Amino acid sequence: SCTIKDLPVPLYYCNNGYALSSLSITDCLVSINTASTIFIAFNGQGWIKDLSFSNSTIYYTVPGSAYFVQMRGRTPSNFSGSGWSTSLRKMSNCTFYQIGTNNRFFNNVINSNSAVFFLEMQNTIFADCVVSSATGTEGVFRRICNAGNYGNVNYTLGYNTYYYSAVPGGFLDYDTSDENGRDHSGTAIKVEPKFVNAANGDFTLSSSEHIAKRCGDPRWLPTTE
């Protein structure tokens, strides 16, 4: 659990070929005030086997142009002796805002046909993330799966929102030129989250649909009796 305001540098930085078995961001509120700051940066040959975000809000106070998570195309098999054969990416009840507005989110995180990857993404809100223009060219799901590797990703998706204020209609949960790279769960909530004041870091929800499904970081939801 943590609160970090105006993070100027990566929360976690590694420039060598080290690997973590797991990294969890839980019950955190983090604002980043520099567009080029990478949140988690493995700029060498490093890797995180299991990476999870839960009950957290991470947002840029200016449109973020950097990767949210950067790893240099490693896979579990690159770490001999680890015994790793699978990898997990999990996002549950999180709120993300203005991340990867230059078509960036994750890079080369799911990159190998010889590894098994699991993606669990549920009750999470992505607002103004991973879109580069008024017409939009990217999508959250596509960028996590590193376009073209969907076949070896075992994914569980439920009640996520992909809202883009600059896109006509407000939603673009996939790259229109890449039909595979979208949320096919049939559960995506295509209604504006209606944050109270996102520009000033208040992501309290007024959308009845999101409140009913308990979407996003719980800190922005009304308490239940």
Tell what function each PLM region has.
Residues D178, A198-E225:
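Surface beta-loop-beta hairpin patches that serve as ligand-binding interfaces in beta-rich domains
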Residues S1-G201, T224:
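Extracellular beta-rich repeat passengers
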